[in-house]
Amino acid sequence: MRKKQKSAVENETVYLHTRGVIKDNAVMALLGDKLFRQRVEKKRKGKGSYQRKAKHPGKIFEKPDYKFF
């Protein structure tokens, strides 16, 4: 009896690149893709973390007795 071999391709997710047809060098083509572009991370703590805008704009919680028509 012959054992069935599981292929590794079935479990892997396939990335749909935006480079069209890759002809020569797949690694260099994927490095130029939008997935590997440089991103600026926002500071969460420290000097550059101050945000001028409110976290939840437009959500003002008032007491219901102020709303008389």
From Swiss-Prot:
One Gene Ontology term of the molecular function aspect: rRNA binding
Keywords: RNA-binding, rRNA-binding, Translation regulation
Biological process (GO), any one: rescue of stalled ribosome
InterPro entries membership: ArfA (IPR005589)
Family stated for the protein in its record: Belongs to the alternative ribosome-rescue factor A family.
Functional description taken from the UniProt entry: Rescues ribosomes stalled at the 3' end of non-stop mRNAs. Recruits release factor 2 (RF2) to the stalled ribosome, helping position it correctly in the ribosomal A site so its GGQ motif can hydrolyze the peptidyl-tRNA bond.
The protein's assembly and partners: Interacts with the 70S ribosome and release factor 2.
Name recorded for this polypeptide: Alternative ribosome-rescue factor A
Organism of provenance: Haemophilus influenzae (strain ATCC 51907 / DSM 11121 / KW20 / Rd)
